[in-house]
Amino acid sequence: LKQAVNSCQKKETIILTGLGEVSKSVFCVALNEALDGKGSICVITATREEIRNYRRELAYFYPDLPTQELYPETLPRIQVETQSLEITAARAAALRFLQGEEQGIVFVTAEALEQKLLRPSQGEAQRLKIKMGQTLDQKEIMQKLLDLGYERTEQVDAIGQFASRGEILDVYPINMNDPVRIEWFDTDIDGLRTFDIDSQRSKENLDALSIASITVFSTEEYTASVFDYCAENTLVIVDEPVRLFDMLDKFEKENKPYAEDIFTVEELKGFMQ
């Protein structure tokens, strides 16, 4: 364990063999705690079958830590309106965990690993950002939300929706766990707070808000890998590399028509060195 910790601190790749199913999870936990225990954990597996085992074992050691799978996208990429908003929100949550915005456990299958992602900087640039005290026109904000793919409704009761009444605008960003209530005083932002979607009660005051886009823009560049999203203290575990690469090779052959949307096996091997 000490040698593994030293290698991780030096950002080196380590290879372990001879661990059983339960032992893998135990070692992951021990390694994570020995490092600092404050970062997210990313577990990369060949299939979802392995995810079920890791999810069960890691939940025992981290019962309060949220878990999320980075679900693969449908290729060719299509507008999210024809996909599930819940899946889109789950992907956004997984990427937040990887980037260290929140601590959590992320599971990534070979299929998801192989797909190219939007560059983090580009996704950040397309967000709608609002700060307390900022002067903003409510109608312009609502138009921007429509441009980003959000649906206007009478009342917000699901992710990806927004609703307006008087000087109040409610929105449920796909990159947040709760909806947010934005309040105006004249043209200035006077209140930003999350609220419970069932009781409508306020939960947490915010200084700023960043709303991610739902719409897939034609100008977006998908050139990033999962590893480009990982923060410095995100612990990346690659389970059964031989089986993983066999599965990646299979997906690469099956997705030849979409070669521009996926990484080659050799490229992914290079990322892991």
Label each region the model flagged.
Residues 1-273:
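ASCE RecA-like P-loop NTPase motor cores
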